[in-house]
């Protein structure tokens, strides 16, 4: 028998699995689920191993298979993205960003980026990694009418402030940023352009969003677990020269990481192949579903932002819920009905700590096979909550609704033979 405290922890895990995997409508824009095969191969001996260094030059022995996995994954990403260099060792998108900043921006240098209220990620701002690296930040100007970077004002800012690095991409990201236009002015001041593709990485790989490396960015960073539905991890892809790529490598290790969470490599590779096979359909459906959900919410009297632009061209929908009590209140109320979203600041908010909005992402529910009709049903659930209907009644309806959407699509299945091979290799069968 297991100790009771262990049984208690196992029970928590099982209850969480059941709740989030089977009973909730998961609309967090930064999350997703792996395919059955990717989730299975995520369980491997590499979870407890180290491989400091780079392929072919390690500080540890016993890494022959690590080198095969890391080399294969890096080369495959490079081929898919059209990159000269890829580093898959960062353990998150934020670590990938920090390594890029450290390699490309001198101490005391300047970074131009979007503030949080305009969608910028914490790692793009002095509240996050920029402060730790003693870098200065200047805010890219925002065009509220077009819900995007103000190109003309940004051009003037870049020419005046002459930043070392310009960060595009965002945490709240509804429309592609003007990479080409910013890259052109960056060239005149010698600035690097980094596109943080964390949120839209799967859309890029699936061809539903512009590839920033082909639009003029010098490098892109990403996480591998949002619209790209793999395990949590990070990646850096560049079109830079060998010297700069080597600086990035040295920033990843030994500066910011020692262990690269090697057990994710195989699952990430499986996911990348899945995106080659299913990604175009999956990415297209994600964008279609986001637009359908936005239109349905508007019809229900819960209007998303950016109506003039068609609401969204990504997986995200942003809704101003100030008239319903604000982002904090609405996100908590929706969770009571088993609808999971996050509060989010909007450009007109005076404080990001008291946001007027919520952010919604459809990538996970799309992977469970939902389409436009289901998006309209989700909009009705959300509207019912905001109109004050008993959340317990809505919760029961949500749980019943999810029963029809439990199978993960756009990925590889598993067989008993594969399960046996993995478990026997780990000696998990007794």
Swiss-Prot record:
<feature type="modified residue" description="N6-(pyridoxal phosphate)lysine">
    <location>
        <position position="226"/>
    </location>
</feature>
<comment type="subunit">
    <text>Homodimer.</text>
</comment>
<dbReference type="GO" id="GO:0030170">
    <property type="term" value="F:pyridoxal phosphate binding"/>
</dbReference>
<dbReference type="GO" id="GO:0035999">
    <property type="term" value="P:tetrahydrofolate interconversion"/>
</dbReference>
<dbReference type="GO" id="GO:0004372">
    <property type="term" value="F:glycine hydroxymethyltransferase activity"/>
</dbReference>
<dbReference type="InterPro" id="IPR015422">
    <property type="entry name" value="PyrdxlP-dep_Trfase_small"/>
</dbReference>
<dbReference type="GO" id="GO:0019264">
    <property type="term" value="P:glycine biosynthetic process from serine"/>
</dbReference>
<comment type="similarity">
    <text>Belongs to the SHMT family.</text>
</comment>
<dbReference type="InterPro" id="IPR039429">
    <property type="entry name" value="SHMT-like_dom"/>
</dbReference>
<keyword id="KW-0028">Amino-acid biosynthesis</keyword>
<dbReference type="GO" id="GO:0005737">
    <property type="term" value="C:cytoplasm"/>
</dbReference>
<feature type="site" description="Plays an important role in substrate specificity">
    <location>
        <position position="225"/>
    </location>
</feature>
<comment type="pathway">
    <text>Amino-acid biosynthesis; glycine biosynthesis; glycine from L-serine: step 1/1.</text>
</comment>
<dbReference type="InterPro" id="IPR019798">
    <property type="entry name" value="Ser_HO-MeTrfase_PLP_BS"/>
</dbReference>
<dbReference type="InterPro" id="IPR001085">
    <property type="entry name" value="Ser_HO-MeTrfase"/>
</dbReference>
<dbReference type="Pfam" id="PF00464">
    <property type="entry name" value="SHMT"/>
</dbReference>
<comment type="function">
    <text>Catalyzes the reversible interconversion of serine and glycine with a modified folate serving as the one-carbon carrier. Also exhibits a pteridine-independent aldolase activity toward beta-hydroxyamino acids, producing glycine and aldehydes, via a retro-aldol mechanism.</text>
</comment>
<feature type="binding site">
    <location>
        <begin position="120"/>
        <end position="122"/>
    </location>
    <ligand>
        <name>(6S)-5,6,7,8-tetrahydrofolate</name>
    </ligand>
</feature>
<dbReference type="InterPro" id="IPR015421">
    <property type="entry name" value="PyrdxlP-dep_Trfase_major"/>
</dbReference>
<keyword id="KW-0663">Pyridoxal phosphate</keyword>
<keyword id="KW-0554">One-carbon metabolism</keyword>
<dbReference type="InterPro" id="IPR049943">
    <property type="entry name" value="Ser_HO-MeTrfase-like"/>
</dbReference>
<keyword id="KW-0808">Transferase</keyword>
<dbReference type="InterPro" id="IPR015424">
    <property type="entry name" value="PyrdxlP-dep_Trfase"/>
</dbReference>
<keyword id="KW-0963">Cytoplasm</keyword>
<protein>
    <recommendedName>
        <fullName>Serine hydroxymethyltransferase</fullName>
        <ecNumber>2.1.2.-</ecNumber>
    </recommendedName>
</protein>
């Amino acid at each position: 028998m297991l100790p009771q405290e262990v049984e208690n922890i196992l029970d928590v895990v099982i209850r969480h699995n059941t709740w989030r995997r089977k009973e909730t409508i998961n609309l967090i824009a930064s999350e997703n689920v792996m395919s059955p095969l990717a989730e299975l191969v995520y369980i491997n001996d590499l979870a407890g191993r180290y491989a400091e260094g780079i392929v072919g030059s390690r500080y540890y022995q016993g890494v022959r298979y690590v080198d095969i996995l890391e080399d294969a994954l890096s080369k495959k990403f490079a081929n898919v993205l059209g990159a000269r260099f890829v580093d898959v060792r960062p353990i998150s998108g934020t670590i990938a960003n920090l390594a890029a900043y450290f390699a490309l921006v001198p101490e005391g240098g300047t970074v131009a980026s979007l503030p949080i209220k305009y969608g910028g990620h914490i790692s793009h701002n002095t509240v996050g990694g920029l402060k730790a690296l003693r870098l200065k930040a200047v805010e890219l100007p925002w065009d509220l009418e077009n819900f995007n970077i103000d190109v003309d004002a940004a051009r003037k800012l870049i020419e005046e402030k002459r930043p070392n690095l310009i960060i595009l991409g965002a945490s709240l990201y509804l429309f592609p940023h003007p990479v080409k236009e910013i890259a052109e002015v960056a060239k005149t001041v010698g600035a690097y352009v980094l596109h943080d593709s964390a949120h839209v990485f799967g859309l890029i790989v699936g061809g539903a969003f512009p590839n920033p490396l082909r639009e003029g960015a010098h490098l892109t960073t990403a996480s591998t677990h949002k619209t790209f539905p793999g395990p949590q991890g990070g990646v850096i892809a560049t079109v830079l020269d060998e010297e700069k790529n080597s600086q990035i490598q040295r920033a990843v290790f030994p500066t910011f990481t020692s262990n690269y969470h090697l057990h994710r490599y195989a699952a990430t590779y499986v996911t990348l192949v899945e995106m080659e096979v299913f990604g175009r359909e999956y990415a297209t459906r994600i964008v279609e579903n986001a637009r359908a959900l936005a239109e349905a919410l508007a019809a229900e009297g819960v209007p998303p932002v950016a109506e003039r632009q068609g609401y969204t061209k990504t997986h995200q929908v942003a809704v101003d819920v100030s008239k319903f009590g604000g982002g904090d209140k609405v996100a908590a109320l929706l969770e009571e009905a088993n609808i999971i979203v996050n509060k989010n600041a909007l450009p007109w908010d005076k404080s990001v700590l008291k946001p007027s909005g919520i952010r919604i992402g459809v990538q996970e529910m799309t992977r469970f096979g939902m389409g436009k009709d289901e998006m309209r049903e989700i909009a009705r659930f959300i509207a019912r909550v905001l109109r004050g209907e008993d959340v317990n009644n809505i919760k029961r309806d949500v749980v019943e609704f999810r029963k029809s959407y439990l199978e993960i699509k756009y990925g590889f299945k598993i067989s008993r033979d594969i399960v046996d091979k993995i478990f026997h290799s780990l000696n998990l069968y007794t």
